[in-house]
């Protein structure tokens, strides 16, 4: 076993090599404080025939890592939690650009959290563990990467804060990359205020992150290189194209290729290129269909890049900084609390807002919290197949849908003034031609306002792209699906006029330089200003229907009265909810009663509850200690019998009192009893 210790960027990491999981291609035990992660890489020796990178990343949390047993009926880990899926995506998006373009060997990277001490950052630890395991595997010529998190407390940036410091921060910036450039960025604002970060400060934070990554990656390469396995798969020379076929495409089918490029819909574009491939295949049998498709893809990509970089024009004829036409409609769904239809070009998001009570909040188990945590603001993103013209079934929520919903949530969360309010936004993507997550942010912000939710400001989102060729590059505002597919960067940025509340950057290159990112940030600000102007105009036309929105009424009763509102087995509370069609949250320790629903029904419910409690008090006042009564058995329970009293109300005759007198009762019996006490609004009885 080899044991390695590396200290950099405010952390000391320990790596135990060749200790466990030795049948994997490579494996290691990563340790930071009391956080321990097992990282393994497994590679199959036979490549797949399809043209894609068969990489799978799985991040798994074990409950025992925090000394806990899983909640719920089944006491073992089951379906992956949201945090596990989002962390898997985070690692995948960092590592994927590092692989050679022609790498086709099925590869699985598994990260198992075996111990977690709460204070250390699981996502940074997991990515660094995955990077080290992948670098040591030497399955291909892959650079070393690392991750860091940047927080901001006051005016000070902090590298790799612990959980306590991050909870005080107004910024959560996660960055990964090599020693030369950045591969992936996730950012959100934190705190009770909006805390949007201005572009110059964002650049400063990214510079700090890059400095940290350079230090860590340099150490990783120096220390891990002697421990690498033998290189398994050398990078090939790539695809060798038939020049005669390329000339044929450029000379005889160029106009049709341009027509396909300029087709705005994905389904229409695919039909054009499929038809070109079919024609060539029928006319030139010497070329295989696969060869034709690859050559067609190369010509298409070359022409798109030439069009953008040299001619400064995009496939849909827009200028580089031009945003597609925007149309905003509101109040489409009469029964929802709000609904906004946001259309930008051929991308369309219908966001529906619903307000709820504490009982409606989503609960999650987490290694970092002893008790389940409540998610009060939920943003769910759905991408049905018909939005891109595909005929396929709608299945379970995909990783992509979860990730896009999480991004939109992060963009909007700090714009909400009352963080205790329970809100669910659902984005239904009805059409998609790029930037659907950012359309969801725009529609979601307006949906919050239309729901009567107090917000600090409207938030707009825009997806930026980049096309590069050698030393030349072009930044694109509001990218389409084609520009996303053929471009080198997908940089989603959301915020208001003052700054950024969330962003996410992915690249298909080995990394992006800071100066390019800053150019994209400034260009995105212009696009955001344009979109926000249209959103503010739409906001002025929104009429909030307060009579339809749920009202919340909060009042307090004596804590011992809460059990009276609940009733035996929840009978009373169920009857109240069914009768008035409201939602009720009860807090036993404080005696707080929260009612939510239609305003008129809420007020009637409050009146009913107070009158009900008052009537119970009056019933108690009719009886005195040691008073002898003739009562009737109402119902028998395990611990005794409830008796109907002659002047109203009921009392409890406990089982031990019945046993002492050797009395056997059945429902309907009449019996003499004596009042012995009043306990929390209950009358306790004994046999007379």
UniProtKB/Swiss-Prot annotation:
It is an enzyme of class 2 (transferase). One of its GO terms (biological process) is RNA processing. It catalyses: RNA(n+1) + phosphate = RNA(n) + a ribonucleoside 5'-diphosphate. It is found in: Cytoplasm. GO terms for cellular component: cytosol. Gene3D superfamilies: GHMP Kinase, N-terminal domain (3.30.230.70), K Homology domain, type 1 (3.30.1370.10), Nucleic acid-binding proteins (2.40.50.140). GO terms for molecular function: 3'-5'-RNA exonuclease activity; magnesium ion binding; polyribonucleotide nucleotidyltransferase activity; RNA binding. Mg(2+) binds at residues 484, 490. Residues 550-609 form the KH domain. Pfam families: KH_1, RNase_PH, RNase_PH_C, S1. Belongs to the polyribonucleotide nucleotidyltransferase family. Involved in mRNA degradation. Catalyzes the phosphorolysis of single-stranded polyribonucleotides processively in the 3'- to 5'-direction. This is Polyribonucleotide nucleotidyltransferase. It comes from Helicobacter pylori (strain Shi470). The gene is pnp.
């Amino acid at each position: 076993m080899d044991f390695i210790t590396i200290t950099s960027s405010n952390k000391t990491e320990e790596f135990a090599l060749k200790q466990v999981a030795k049948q994997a291609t490579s494996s290691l035990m990563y340790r930071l404080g009391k956080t321990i992660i097992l990282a393994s890489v497994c590679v199959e020796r036979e490549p797949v025939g399809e043209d894609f990178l068969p990489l799978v990343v799985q991040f798994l949390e074990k409950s025992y890592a925090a000394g806990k047993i899983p909640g719920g009926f089944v006491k073992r880990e089951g379906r992956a939690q949201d945090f596990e899926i989002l962390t898997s995506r985070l690692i995948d998006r960092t590592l994927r650009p590092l692989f050679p373009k022609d790498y086709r060997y099925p590869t699985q990277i598994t990260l198992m959290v075996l111990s977690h001490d709460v204070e250390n950052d699981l996502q940074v630890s997991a990515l660094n563990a995955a990077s080290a395991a992948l670098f040591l595997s030497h399955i291909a010529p892959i650079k070393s990467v690392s991750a860091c998190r940047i927080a901001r407390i006051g005016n000070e940036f902090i590298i790799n804060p612990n959980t306590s410091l991050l909870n005080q921060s107004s910024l959560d910036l996660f960055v990964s990359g090599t020693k030369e450039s950045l591969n992936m960025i996730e950012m959100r604002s934190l705190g009770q205020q909006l805390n949007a970060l201005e572009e110059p400060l964002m650049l400063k934070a990214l510079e700090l992150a890059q400095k940290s990554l350079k230090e860590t990656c340099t150490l990783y390469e120096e220390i891990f290189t002697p421990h690498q396995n033998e290189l398994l798969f050398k990078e090939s020379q790539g695809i060798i194209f038939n020049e005669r076929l390329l000339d044929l495409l450029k000379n005889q089918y160029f106009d049709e290729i341009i027509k396909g490029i300029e087709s705005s819909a994905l389904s229409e574009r695919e039909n054009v290129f499929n038809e070109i491939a079919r024609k060539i295949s029928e006319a030139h049998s010497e070329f295989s269909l696969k060869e034709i498709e690859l050559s067609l893809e190369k010509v298409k990509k070359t022409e798109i890049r030439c069009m953008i970089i040299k001619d400064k024009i995009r496939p849909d004829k827009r200028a580089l900084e031009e945003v597609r036409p925007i149309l905003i409609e509101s109040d489409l769904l009469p029964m929802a609390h709000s609904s906004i239809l946001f259309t930008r070009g051929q991308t369309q998001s219908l966001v529906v807002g619903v307000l709820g009570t504490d009982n409606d909040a989503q609960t999650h188990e987490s290694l970092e919290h002893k008790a389940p945590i409540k998610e009060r603001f939920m943003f769910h993103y759905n991408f049905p197949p018909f939005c891109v013209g595909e005929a396929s079934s709608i299945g379970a929520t995909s990783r992509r849908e979860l990730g896009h919903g999480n991004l939109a949530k992060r963009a909007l969360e700090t714009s909400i003034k009352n963080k205790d309010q329970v809100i669910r936004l659902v984005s239904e993507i009805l059409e998609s031609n790029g930037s659907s997550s950012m359309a969801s942010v725009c529609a979601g912000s307006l949906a919050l306002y239309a729901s009567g939710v107090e917000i600090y400001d409207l938030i707009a989102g825009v997806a930026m792209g980049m096309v590069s060729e050698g030393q030349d590059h072009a930044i694109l505002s509001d990218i389409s699906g084609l520009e996303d597919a053929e471009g080198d960067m997908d940089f989603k940025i959301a915020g208001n006029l003052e700054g950024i509340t969330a962003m996410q950057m992915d690249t298909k290159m080995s990394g992006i330089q800071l100066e390019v990112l800053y150019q994209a940030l400034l260009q995105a600000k212009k696009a955001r200003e344009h979109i926000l102007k249209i959103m503010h105009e739409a906001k002025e036309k929104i009429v909030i229907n307060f009579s339809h929105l749920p009202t919340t009424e909060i009042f307090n009763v004596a804590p011992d009265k809460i059990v009276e509102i609940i009733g035996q087995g929840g009978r009373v509370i169920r009857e109240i909810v069914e009768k008035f069609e409201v939602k009720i949250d009860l807090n036993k320790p404080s005696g707080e009663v929260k009612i939510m629903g239609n305003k008129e029904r809420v007020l009637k419910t409050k009146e009913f509850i107070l009158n009900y409690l008052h009537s119970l008090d009056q019933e108690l006042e009719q009886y005195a200690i040691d008073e002898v009564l003739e009562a009737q058995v109402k119902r028998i329970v395990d611990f005794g019998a409830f008796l109907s009293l002659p002047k109203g109300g009921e009392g409890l005759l406990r089982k031990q009192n019945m046993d002492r007198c050797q009395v056997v009762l059945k429902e309907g019996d009449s019996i003499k009893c004596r009042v012995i006490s009043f306990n929390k609004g209950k009358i306790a009885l004994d046999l007379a």
